[in-house]
Design a protein with these regions (language model features):
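Alpha/beta enzyme core
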Residues: 2-218
Length: 219
């Protein structure tokens, strides 16, 4: 999957918008690939729903197995949602090993506490300190054996601590080794976040009603 990683890295840093629809299994991966998308997104939340459990109950190996099944059947670059990293930095290292071997093109981690609280699904975030998250990001960055594997750092701070705090956290995560910043915020805040963070910006939308040009304008 080195070629998929390289293609994804080039797409991310190429300056255009990259769309990554939800992919949960080989069939959906093939559909997304045949439809011409540049990447797919293996969501922890959606995978938990598929298994009829909360994302908080998923294990490293369950997610890695799902990723491996997808990447074994298609060449689509796959973003793997690593949730909160399954514990401390040492657990993040194990996760990177597993996801990299499973063919991930990028791995996303977020700054919620571990184990992840199910309150996230009703809009309540329980965040770790910036220093704790930076330690996880640094561990992830150092653990990868393929430099083309992207580390995506996501913050939930904007919901409850404000946009400025979210931006400050994201820039700290980038300094710690994250390649891409992910913000979960209102559409109207995305342009500000993009202009004030020093890495490509990613976000999640459950019902995308924007055109590619509108996403470019957001940054």
């Amino acid at each position: 999957m080195t070629d998929a990683r390289r293609r994804f890295r080039e797409a991310i840093f190429g300056g255009d918008v990259v769309f990554a629809p939800l992919v949960l299994d080989p069939l959906s991966g093939l559909i997304v690939e045949e439809s011409g998308f540049s990447a797919g997104y293996l969501s922890g939340g959606a995978l938990g729903f598929q298994y009829a459990v909360s994302e908080a109950l998923l294990t490293t190996t369950e997610i890695a197995d799902a990723a491996r099944r997808i990447t074994s059947r298609c060449q689509l670059p796959l973003i793997v949602d690593g949730g909160v990293g399954f514990g401390d930095p040492v657990h993040v290292v194990r996760a990177i090993w597993e996801f990299e071997q499973a063919g991930a093109a990028a791995v996303e981690f977020e700054d919620q506490v571990s184990p992840k609280r199910v309150h996230h699904h009703i809009g309540i975030e329980h965040l770790v300190s910036t220093d704790e998250m930076c330690a996880k990001v640094a561990a992830a960055s150092e653990a990868r054996s393929d430099s083309d594997l992207l580390i995506i750092a996501r913050t939930g701070a904007m919901r409850h601590e404000g946009v400025d705090e979210g931006i400050a956290r994201l820039n700290s995560y980038i300094e710690a080794g994250a390649d891409v910043a992910m913000a979960f915020c209102r559409d109207q805040d995305l342009q500000q976040v993009a202009s004030k963070t020093s890495a490509p910006l990613a976000t999640i939308t459950s019902l995308d009603q924007h055109s590619p040009q509108e996403w470019r304008d957001y940054g």
